[in-house]
A protein has these predicted regions:
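Transmembrane beta-barrel wall of Gram-negative outer-membrane proteins
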Residues: 298, 310-419, 446-448
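Short, acidic, small-residue-rich periplasmic hinge/interaction motif at the N-terminus
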Residues: 35-37, 46-50, 78-82, 96-148, ...
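Short, surface-exposed beta-strand/beta-hairpin micro-motifs centered on an aromatic residue
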Residues: 61-68, 202
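Periplasmic N-terminal accessory/gating domains of Gram-negative outer-membrane beta-barrel systems
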Residues: 119-122, 126-174, 189-223, 230-233
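Transmembrane beta-barrel strands of outer-membrane/channel proteins
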Residues: 247-255, 346-354, 406-412, 465-471, ...
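Short, acidic Ser/Thr/Gly-rich low-complexity loop/linker segments typical of extracellular
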Residues: 53-63
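N-terminal, post-signal-peptide soluble/periplasmic segments
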Residues: 129, 224-315, 319-325, 342-345
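Face-selective signature of the C-terminal outer-membrane beta-barrel domain
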Residues: 397, 403, 441-598
């Protein structure tokens, strides 16, 4: 009996010991805000707590929050240029302890030698925070570290994550609610050429995020900026040359439950299209200038038109496309080396991704007051995006105060889409329709720059300069549409629509836009202390030259102005075997004035 009582007492003490140990090993939360004596929030201040391996770092608002073991603890706060602050706290289990340290500036430093000042890497969150802190204007920044935490694939995806910036049409940036034409885009400090034929805008989906270090959005004007914007400036910076040898490679596959391993009818990709380059089959052949054209509805020489039509790629066949998981590859190599006695570095980075996407939609136009339906048709779409690009950057440090960078970027973006449409398109006339379309958009961006950075005196004066060459090429090669009409939905009366309107009939469209931008800029800044205040004086010069060329050609199938009975698919109705002077042929849709101008040239 006595032994049993002793055992029970021992077990009680052991249990109490475990309970005490459990309570001591629990954690509470230490939260607060670090500020200076002048009321300035301190970004990047570090907090250390005795008895804990955890530490905290303040964010862009000077705030911190991290878990700390319970009990009496000492907190040490460190910030560059300020005395180390020590304070005592009592942390309770699962409770918050608020601490708002106020830091005092270092008034005197004796016997201190600064061995090395380390700058945050440009692709880190710390560098993005520092950019925002040190800027004289209102800026937001996002870094490659942020890219890795999300599903960001393109520059437009990254811009969506920045406060005050939105993306329209999946690629154009709106800053502070202002449309793309009022904003400016810069790549490594040089202006980006426009990718649009009818407006000043850049399509940000053509640059893969894997090739970038960071993106900075400037939302307010400062005297040292070029005044060609109203909303903001988007500054894109490609990967910089590393200080030590690095080599990274990644491979991944994307699965989509709606798309992957599903089979659908589509025009598909072939050959070089998998690399992001248009197939040569999509080019416009060299045509006889006597080929018929608008406003005539028929050719003066149908036999000639038929022969010219046979020069095109007349393969309209649909293929059974089985969508496989989407692959993604990336590779980066960075290495420092000696160029004579000069320090130099090289960075080579390549990114490739292909992303198919299947979607279905239903479009209904209805008067709900009378319950009358004007239109009711469905679309089945298979779109494929191919991104292929890379950067090659070289940096040469002439000495401690002079550096020259060579930055080069090539980006290829290829979007191919197949759309199959069916349903009611005109209720007033009882017209049902079937449509087949194949559209491709190709974008190529080439950017080459030489940048210089020079410091003078005790780093009070800085001179930077940029020589830039940029080129964008955008093409819509062989956009095809075939439309069929079914009066009252009767399949027996199915007809191929032939009219003078490409988008409402049957035809082909080609367009090419090429813009070259050459620019040069130089900026000078001088730092001066006047009394107790610090001032920065800046001045600069900028010049650029833009040259743009745009061409488009539209073809419709003739004889124009009627319907051709058909129960077949486009591959039979518009294939090479169907082309003849007595059956069907292409006619170029152009104005009479343009025709005369070309004949006289």
């Amino acid at each position: 009996m006595v032994n049993s009582i002793r055992k029970a007492i021992v077990l009680i003490f052991i249990a109490a010991g475990f309970m005490t140990l459990s309570a001591q090993t629990g954690k509470g939360l230490l939260v607060g805000k670090v500020m200076s004596e002048t009321g300035r929030v301190l970004v990047g201040a570090k907090l250390f707590v005795t008895g804990s391996q955890d530490s905290g770092v303040t964010d862009v608002e000077g705030k911190f929050s991290f878990a700390v073991p319970v009990g009496a603890r000492k907190v040490f706060v460190e910030a560059a240029g300020y005395d180390v602050l020590e304070d005592s706290v009592m942390i309770e289990l699962d409770k918050e302890f608020f601490l708002n340290p106020v830091m005092s500036t270092i008034s005197r430093m004796e016997g201190v030698e600064i061995v090395k000042r380390k700058k945050p890497k440009e692709n880190t969150v710390a560098a993005a925070i520092q950019t925002k802190q040190l800027s004289s204007g209102m800026v937001e920044a996002i870094s490659a570290e942020d890219f890795a935490k999300t599903t960001i694939r393109t520059t437009s995806d990254a811009i969506k994550r920045i406060p005050g910036a939105t993306i329209s049409e999946g690629k154009f940036a709106n800053i502070r609610g202002m449309f793309d034409r009022y904003n400016a885009g810069y790549l490594n400090g040089a202006p980006l050429p426009s990718t649009e034929s009818d407006r000043k805008a850049f399509s940000f989906d053509v640059i893969p995020a894997a090739l970038l270090d960071n993106i900075v959005v400037v939302k307010s004007a400062t005297p040292d900026m070029i005044g060609d914007f109203g909303g903001g400036i988007i500054q894109i910076n490609t990967k910089s040359v590393p200080e030590k040898f690095i080599q990274t490679a990644s491979i991944g596959f994307q699965y989509n439950s709606i798309t992957t391993f599903n089979t659908m009818d589509a025009f598909g990709l072939e050959g070089s299209e998998y690399l992001g380059l248009p197939s040569a089959k999509r080019n416009i052949p060299v045509l006889d200038p006597k080929m018929g054209f608008e406003p005539h509805t028929t050719s003066k020489d149908p036999a000639l038109n038929a022969r010219e039509t046979l020069k095109f790629n007349n393969d309209w066949s649909l293929k059974k496309v089985n969508v496989m998981p989407a692959p993604r590859f990336s590779y980066s190599l960075g290495m420092p080396f000696k160029l004579g006695k000069k320090e130099a570095g090289l960075l080579v980075s390549w990114n490739y991704a292909i992303s198919p996407r299947r979607s279905e939609g239903n479009i209904v136009s209805k008067d709900y007051s009378t319950n009358y339906t004007y239109k009711d048709f469905s679309d089945e779409i298979l779109s494929t995006n191919v991104q292929n690009g890379g950067v090659v950057n070289l940096s040469v440090k002439l000495n401690k105060k002079n550096r020259i960078d060579f930055r080069n970027l090539l980006s290829l973006t290829y979007d191919a889409g197949s759309t199959l449409r069916s349903g009611l398109t005109d209720a007033d006339n009882g017209m049902y329709s079937e449509g087949f379309s194949n559209q491709v958009n190709f974008n190529r961006l080439v950017s080459s720059q030489v940048n210089g950075l020079h410091s003078f005196g005790k780093d009070k004066s800085k001179l930077t300069w940029v020589l830039n060459y940029g080129n964008t090429y955008r093409a819509v090669p062989d956009f095809r549409i075939a439309n069929y009409a079914l009066p009252e939905g009767d399949i027996a009366n199915r007809q191929l629509v032939l009219n003078a309107f490409f988008n409402a009939g049957t035809g082909r469209f080609f367009s090419y836009m090429n813009e070259t931008n050459v620019s040069a800029s130089t900026d000078y800044s001088y730092n001066a202390d006047l009394g107790k205040t610090h001032h920065v004086f800046k001045t600069g010069v900028f010049a650029q030259n833009r040259v743009r060329d745009f061409q488009s050609r539209q073809f419709v199938y003739a004889p124009v102005g009627g319907f051709k009975p058909s129960s077949a698919l486009p591959e039979q109705d518009l294939g090479a075997s169907a082309i003849s002077a007595s059956n069907i042929y292409l006619i170029e849709k152009r104005s009479e004035e343009r025709r005369v101008g070309k004949e006289c040239a």
